Amino acid sequence: MPSEKTFTIGDVSQQTGVASVTLRAWERRYGLIKPQRTAKGHRVYNQGNIQDIQHILSWLNRGVAISKVATLLASGKSSAAAAPVAEQWLVEQNKLLAGITELKQTSLNQQLDRLNKSVPFITLCEYVYHPLQATLAQRWQQQPLGYQLEQQLWQQSWQRQTLIMALRTEKQKLQGHCYLASLDLKGPSLGYYLLHSLLLQSGLRVTAFSKVEDLAGLTRLHNNAEWPLIVYAEQRIEQTAFKPLANLSTMWKDGILCCGLASDIHHEQLTSLGIDFVDGHSNDAWQSAVMKTWLEQTKR
C-alpha cells in the first residue's frame, strides 16, 4: 500500500500562499493545524492538513477573527453560507489607527507583529492595510497638528516589518532573487512596503531601493541583470524617465515589470515601449495573471 504523500512547511507555504511563520502560529497559538513530526522534529503536512488550511482561509476571508476559527471548524459549518463579517476588519483598522494617531510606536509595532503572524498577508492587504491607508490619506490631507510625525511613525513601522520578514526569508530555502526600485521621490509608500513584503513572503530574496531619483543609475546592476527588476511608483512618472525605463527594459534579460498606481496613469506609454506592467493596489497586482507568470519565471 503506497504511503501517504507529505509536504514540508515550505511546500505548504508555496502551495497555499500562507507564510511559514503564520502556519506555525496557527499550530502553536491557536491549535488549528496538527502536522506530524519527523524523527528530527521537522513538521510534515498531509493533504488533510492542506484542506484544513483552505478552510481556515475561507473563514478569514469572510472576516472572522482567527481566534474564533477553531470553534467554527469544529462545528462543521461551511464558510460559504456565512455572511461576511466586515466589522472584524474595521476593528483591526481602528486599533492600528489609534496607535498611529496617539503616536504609540510600541503598540503599533505589536499590532502589526500580531496581524502579520496570524493572518495571511494578502488578506490583510485587501481588508486592513489598504482601507486604513485611504483613511490616513484623508486625515493627512487636513494636516492636523503633527501629522508628519504620524507619517514617519507609520513608515518606520513598515521599515521594521520588512526587515523582520527579510531576516526570516534568509533562514528559508532560497526561491529566487529580484530587485525592487521605487521611483516615488516623496519616499516609499505603503504600497511599496506591501509589495516588498509579499515578495519576501513568497520566498524571494529582495534587493530593494526605496527612493531612486536617477533611473540611469540602475544600469550599474547590469552584471546581475538575470535577477528580475520591478520598478514601483504610486505617483505620476516624469516624462524624462521613460527613455531610461526603455533602456533598462532592453538591458534586462526578461525585461522589467512596472507596478503601482502610476501604471494606471501611464499604461499607454508603457504599452508602446513594450514594458510589462501591473496596475492597481499591491494585493490586486499580486493576484494578477501577469504577476503569477512573473513569479513562476523568477523561481524557475
Cite the ranges covered by each PLM segment:
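Polyanion-binding surface elements
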Residues: 2-22
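A generic secondary-structure micro-motif detector
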Residues: 12-13, 43-46, 184-185, 208
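Long amphipathic alpha-helical segments
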Residues: 15, 20-24, 31-168
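A short alpha-helix capping/helix-coil boundary motif
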Residues: 1-3, 33-36, 173-176, 225
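C-terminal regulatory/effector modules of DNA-binding transcriptional regulators
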Residues: 159-300
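Surface-exposed charge patches
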Residues: 11, 25, 197
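A short, structure-level motif marking secondary-structure boundaries and short turns
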Residues: 7-9, 39-41, 81, 179-182, ...
